[in-house]
Amino acid sequence: MERSASVGVNDGRFGGNQFYSPSFSSSSSSSSMRHVNYSCGSCGYELNLSSTNRITSTIGSKYGKSMKSGIISFFNIDEGRFSQVDEFQCMPHFSRYSWGLFRHRTKLLCRKCNNYIGNASQEKAPEYALVTQNSDPTSPRIGSVTKYDIRIRSLQPSSAVALL
């Protein structure tokens, strides 16, 4: 399936660029799907962060807001690659789903250069239980899930691997 579009000189959407001609093809889009491994943006230390472990449920309506704030979230990291510093704050905090006077979070630092990478925080488990082939749906759910919020500017891509 091949689709192409051309925009004329007088079309104001692209500033009169007569050479704008995006092409979309199903064969090129499948070969361009890659996952990226990230390393520390300061020293280049491999953090074993992979884009396959990103929380992609926020991609959609909240994706633009997440990118503007410079944060990407992961559900799994290699904790051996980070130094972790527990932080307790005694000040009012408000977010969309919680508020309080005390906040506990864990700062994630690069193990090699101690550059601030992001935060780990506990979140409530979803109201529904995910059932997989090997899981028992009658077993009790875990009360909270750890979410890792990583600053984009603290990372650099170390490699990109094509998915087939």
UniProtKB/Swiss-Prot annotation:
The keyword NAD does not apply. Keywords: Chloroplast, Plastid, Transit peptide. PANTHER family: METHIONINE-S-OXIDE REDUCTASE (PTHR33674), OS01G0833400 PROTEIN (PTHR33674:SF8). GO terms for cellular component: chloroplast. Its main location: plastid. Residues 1-60 form a transit peptide. It is found in: Plastid, Chloroplast. It comes from Arabidopsis thaliana (Mouse-ear cress). It comes from the Eukaryota. This is Uncharacterized protein At4g08330, chloroplastic. The keyword Cytoplasm does not apply. InterPro entries: At4g08330-like (IPR045282).
